[in-house]
Design a protein with these regions (language model features):
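Short mixed-charge
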Residues: 250-254, 327-334
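A structural-propensity feature for long, helix-poor, extended segments
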Residues: 108-112, 269-304, 308
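Adenine-nucleotide phosphate-binding core of ATP-dependent small-molecule kinases
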Residues: 204-211, 299-327
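Asp-based phosphoryl-transfer active-site loop
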Residues: 8-13, 236-240
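Nucleotide/phosphate-binding catalytic cleft detector across ATP-hydrolyzing
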Residues: 1-7, 22, 29-32, 40-231, ...
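Short glycine-rich, Thr/Ser-proximal phosphate-binding strand/loop in the N-terminal lobe
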Residues: 11-37, 78, 86-93, 255-277
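Glycine-rich phosphate-binding loop of actin/hexokinase-like ATP-binding domains
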Residues: 227-289, 354-378
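Extended, charge-rich intrinsically disordered regulatory tails
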Residues: 286-295, 316-321, 369-373, 380, ...
Length: 393
């Protein structure tokens, strides 16, 4: 790609521009449309570029949420959960169909419901119980990826359902491509479909992509820019979400096969828009008060609006996300963190924490949670080089 390009990232809290090797960052004004805010602060820079030379990515939607309904924990729920996580979708809950009558009803709007179960050739798996449950929940999209013999019943009784091939083949192997593509496209459509984002096509003629998607596509190139050693994890902590990208050889139970690297998006682990949910998650972690004492602060820090409070929130986000992908927490994909060689940090966190701040938290996590003296190297992407490299490529 020609170097004379303007690169723009629209985040949930900040937007940043990269031109001629220089990066500028601006805190968003939430009283303004994104386009108007961007133009008011960066008009001089933007006006120098033709629309075909402007490239934009965005993570401003904070990710999508899903509820998964499946027949078994060993196959349908397990397979669909892995595909959803690796498509950057946040899983609100999973429902075992045999317990659907007793299952709780989510209060929030679900972006997409996934229904899955049984191999092709098995019929009559889903019935009225499914329809009754769906009547009680509020969702925007629904996709069926179960046995094809029940597809007619599903289409006949559920409005606007999308039917895709079964994610479980006749040998009980996973078939991930169609569902992963559907979820990825849904995630992208949610971003570019927002009025704020659509307006940005006034300044670019190029496709607007989700930021986590393009960053993930660049991970194999990182060793040419940074001193990293596989296997590694890239953590991007922002205002609304925390994204984690990882080498697939770190996965304890790797059932997906398409990409060398995959990602998780934690929708409620941000330090600005998701601050309250981050604090809630922290207070529900049994080690958080010990961690606060280790950082020489009390829980009163949660009420503060200060630079110190922001640093502590960033450190908590690191600790919580490592907990979520470790053997301590079985709700997410478990990564072999004792095999980790490098931990890369990018995003706003590099403007708030220094290497020592991060190393202290990582060391605490390994000693307290994993009972290990393992010490992966910490790599800081302080100038957003990963994002710049991603969108250029």
């Amino acid at each position: 790609m020609n170097q004379n390009k303007l690169l723009i990232d629209i985040g949930s809290t900040y937007f940043k521009l990269s031109a001629n090797g220089c990066v500028e960052q601006h805190f968003r004004d939430f009283n303004k449309d994104i386009y108007d805010d961007l133009k008011s602060k960066c008009e001089e820079t933007i006006s120098k570029y033709q629309k075909e030379d402007v490239y934009i990515c965005s993570s401003a939607n904070g990710g999508l949420s899903t509820l998964i309904i499946g027949l078994s924990k060993s196959f349908s729920l397990k397979y669909a959960t892995n595909i959803a996580y690796n498509s950057g979708i946040n899983i609100i809950d999973t429902v075992l169909y045999s317990h659907i009558k007793e299952s709780s009803i989510p209060g929030d709007l679900i972006d997409v419901v996934i229904v899955v179960g049984a191999i092709d050739g098995v019929k009559g798996v889903f019935g009225q119980e499914l329809l009754d449950y769906l009547e009680k929940i509020n969702y925007s999209n629904i996709v069926y990826v179960g046995n094809q013999d029940d597809a007619h019943f599903i289409q006949q009784h559920i409005d606007n359902v999308v039917v895709l091939p079964n994610i479980i083949d006749h040998k009980l192997h996973i078939r991930e491509e169609e569902l992963k593509e559907y979820l990825t496209n849904l995630y992208q459509a949610d971003i570019v479909g927002k009025e704020d984002i659509k307006h940005l096509y006034d300044i670019t003629s190029n496709q607007i992509y989700p930021t986590p998607y393009i960053v993930n596509k660049t991970l194999s190139l990182l060793d040419g820019k940074f001193k990293v050693v596989d296997p590694y994890i890239l953590i991007d902590i922002g205002g609304a979400t925390t994204d984690i990208h990882y080498s697939k050889d770190l996965i304890m139970d790797n059932i997906l096969n398409e990409n060398e690297y995959d990602r998780l998006v934690f929708k409620k682990l941000g330090v600005f828009k998701s601050k309250e949910s981050l604090i809630f998650s922290a207070k529900n972690n049994e080690f958080v008060y010990e961690l606060l004492a280790y950082l020489k602060v009390t829980e009163n820090i949660f009420q503060e609006q200060s630079e110190k409070a922001l640093k502590v929130l960033m450190q908590l986000a690191i600790f919580l996300v490592l907990c979520k992908v470790s053997s301590y927490n079985k709700s997410y994909i478990t990564l072999k963190l004792n095999a980790l060689n490098s931990l890369i940090f990018t995003g706003g966190i590099t403007k708030v924490l220094n290497q020592e701040d991060i190393q202290n938290i990582v060391s605490f996590f390994y000693k307290k949670i994993l009972n290990s003296s393992h010490n992966p190297s910490i790599v800081m992407d302080s100038n957003y080089d990963i994002w710049t490299m991603a969108i250029r490529n």
